[in-house]
Amino acid sequence: MANNLIVMTWNVENLFPPEDTDTAAADTYTAKLTYLAGLIVGTGADVVALQEIGSLRAAQDLQAALGEPWQAVVSSHPDSRGIRVAVLARHPLTEEAQILALPPSGLPAVPDVDGDTLTHMGRGALQVHVDCGGVGLRLLTAHLKSKLLTYPGGRRYPLNEDERARGAGYALLRRTAEAVALRVHLNKALAAAAVNGQPGMPTILCGDLNDGPDAITTVLLEGPADGDVNRPDKGDAVRLYNLGRRLPPARAYSRIYQGNGELIDHILATRDLQLQLITIDSLVDDITSIGASTRSRKQTVVPDHAPVIARFNGQRNQPV
């Protein structure tokens, strides 16, 4: 691993290339690419996990704005709106897995609002290997089901309060099934790489998990609980730590919704990386409060989420 490794996760809010005839949208898109690239370069980030990339072209445009030697890997599994996850890095990148199916060993029998059984995540997750020195870094990024509710037939409004309650329950069930699918995938990957009961490959899971650090859908991604990170135990090989718990209290949020800060963008890491963490921050200075309506956001350059960024001391490559 490099002497210092800087990892960022950022929901860049509907980064879609404009239609050829929409000059206003083209100007906004160009300004947004300039803003995104400037902030990424300014932080010195080595690896950036992105959510709400609107197309392969959007990822390529951001890669071009960053310039050499940046590389990109993009998920092949967007949601119905076309948004997907991607990873950009200024080190060699290798795609390792596109994660989509809800596995039999997870929660394979979860219903959706129309009474069908879910078989896959709404937006595919992505696993890459970053060749950043030493054994490198395994990174997974995901964008779990949002709190936005939908109802039978695609309606955005309930017919009654019972249906509203069911809609909220279905959204939570989907997010839970997606989180379990990620954890099942991680269980296998982490266990296979373990060395002497410790992580054999530094691993990060990051992205927009659409709930807070204490929500069960976030906590279950950590794996077995840990009483003391400084004392090795049998759970170390598969455990992740939510680094957001070490954010400065005044900046422990990544989005402002109706005036309230909430931390829904997370970086989880294996024990070796937790012990090598130097700083973590949420770059909240530019974001503003948003509401339920998205119409006013169409011409906005600054995304509604703040990037969360972690800096690691990479000089120690072996687990403690």
Q: Which stretches of residues belong to each language-model region?
A:
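Beta-strand-turn-beta hairpins that frame and shape the catalytic cleft
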Residues: 1-7, 121-163, 317-318
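Active-site flanking residues adjacent to catalytic metal/cofactor-binding acidic residues
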Residues: 10, 51, 142, 207-208
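Structured beta-strand-rich core segments of catalytic domains in phosphoester-bond hydrolases
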Residues: 47, 52-147
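N-terminal, active-site-proximal structural segment of metallo-dependent hydrolase catalytic domains
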Residues: 1-84, 158-159, 179-180, 197-202, ...
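A shared catalytic/ligand-binding motif for oxyanion handling
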Residues: 47, 52, 77-78, 84-85, ...
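A solvent-exposed, charged loop/short amphipathic helix patch at secondary-structure junctions
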Residues: 18-31, 147-173
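Metal-dependent phosphoester-hydrolase catalytic domains
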Residues: 94-99, 119-121, 129, 184-204, ...
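Short catalytic/ligand-binding loop motif for oxyanion handling, primarily in non-cytosolic enzymes
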Residues: 16-18, 56-58, 82, 147-150, ...
